[in-house]
């Protein structure tokens, strides 16, 4: 590679603009590039300059779409993930993977996996309950690679932190007067975790955004929901299943949150809207409506079985102000298909790509089991 004879700062500037998938292909062929790809300074600088992708996880593979080029990278899921369901939390290109053992004595298994490098490490998790809540991040007052795992047991009313370097679990105290009802709806941002949560108590539940600060090891409510989290009746099979509006939480502009919502109106029309917050570090955090459109014929109607089978769609707002959405959309009674959408801020569909043809929507085994916004990286899992 002749360009590697250029000054090192010029070479790095070029490589920072090169997708990590391309660097991985070239890494074995060049000693200088190999050394850079193992240099933590370069790895984290490249990560901070990399663009977001969207990821969908299946039982046997993951798919990562580049929303700008529409290229899709398909990688196999480790054979060790021997379960019919599992979900993930993304942090710096690493995935905290949780799946449930088979049989009567069911408990969670945990592993940290980098799909790009293939590195995989298991985390001791004996007797973790299937309803436990997890988080994945790092303390901002220490080294960037000091990754930690949060575990919350509502049943045992206990909280623990796992340090990936020391490989030890450590308990800490917290008040658990809230619950996260959809743990697959998690957002990692700047080392911390964010979820959609509900208060617990005798009174009417209030929906709000809960956070966990890995530096202070404390939970903190960030803000309330921008609207009443309405519950509607939806007919499923021979019964009535109670579901909320389709809601997706995501990050926005590095230090803010965004919220996607699709609701069914009384006249069988659908409204799609996106809300964004100011900086989550501000003293008062509030929502502003970013986007709203009602019954646009080109926009998808999300698969109504999404939350029943954990197929939560994923989205983010691109720097061009477009909404990047990868979802299962309704495709006739009992069926869905998977499509990627780039939606302009006026509701126009700029790009659409069907990534999976029509399939049965109510629990098909080969369908997506989890999804997230993902930034590919070569970040190593701590030894």
Swiss-Prot record:
Disulfide bonds: none
Signal peptide: none
Domain F-box: 1-47
Superkingdom, taxonomy of origin: Eukaryota
Pfam families registered for this protein in UniProt: FBA_1
NCBIfam families given in the database record: F_box_assoc_1
Protein name: Putative F-box protein At1g77650
């Amino acid at each position: 590679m002749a360009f590697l004879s250029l000054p090192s700062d010029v070479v790095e500037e070029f490589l920072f603009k090169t997708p990590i998938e391309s660097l991985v292909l070239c890494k074995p062929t060049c000693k200088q590039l190999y050394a850079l790809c193992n240099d933590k300074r370069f790895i984290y600088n490249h990560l901070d300059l990399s663009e977001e992708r969207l990821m969908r996880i299946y039982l046997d593979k993951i798919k990562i779409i580049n929303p700008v080029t529409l290229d899709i990278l398909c990688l196999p899921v480790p054979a060790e993930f021997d379960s019919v369901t599992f979900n993930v939390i993304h942090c710096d290109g690493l995935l905290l993977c949780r799946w449930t053992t088979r049989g009567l004595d069911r408990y969670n298994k945990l592993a940290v996996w980098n799909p790009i490098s293939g590195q995989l490490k298991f985390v001791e998790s004996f007797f973790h309950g299937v309803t436990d809540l997890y988080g994945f991040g790092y303390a901002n007052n220490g080294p960037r690679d000091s990754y930690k795992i949060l575990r919350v047991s509502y049943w045992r009313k206990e909280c623990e932190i796992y340090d990936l370097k020391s490989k030890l679990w450590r308990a800490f105290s917290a008040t658990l007067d809230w619950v996260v009802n959809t743990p697959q709806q998690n957002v990692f941002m700047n080392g911390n975790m964010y979820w959609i949560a509900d208060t617990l108590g005798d009174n009417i539940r209030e929906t709000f955004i809960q956070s966990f600060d890995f530096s202070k090891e404390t939970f903190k409510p960030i803000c309330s929901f921008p609207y009443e989290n309405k519950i509607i009746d939806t007919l499923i099979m021979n019964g009535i299943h109670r579901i909320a509006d389709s809601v997706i939480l995501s990050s926005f502009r590095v230090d803010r949150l965004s919220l996607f919502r699709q609701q069914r109106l009384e006249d069988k029309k659908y409204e799609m809207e996106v809300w964004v917050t100011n900086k989550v570090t501000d003293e008062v955090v509030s929502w502003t409506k970013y986007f709203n459109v009602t019954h646009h014929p080109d926009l998808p109607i999300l698969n109504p079985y999404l939350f029943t089978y954990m197929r939560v769609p994923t989205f983010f707002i691109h720097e061009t102000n477009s909404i990047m959405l990868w979802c299962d959309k309704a495709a006739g009674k009992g069926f869905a298909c998977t499509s990627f959408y780039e939606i302009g801020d006026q509701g126009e569909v700029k790009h659409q790509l069907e990534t999976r043809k029509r399939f049965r929507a109510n629990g098909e085994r080969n369908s997506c089991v989890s999804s997230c916004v993902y930034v590919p990286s070569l970040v190593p899992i701590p030894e």
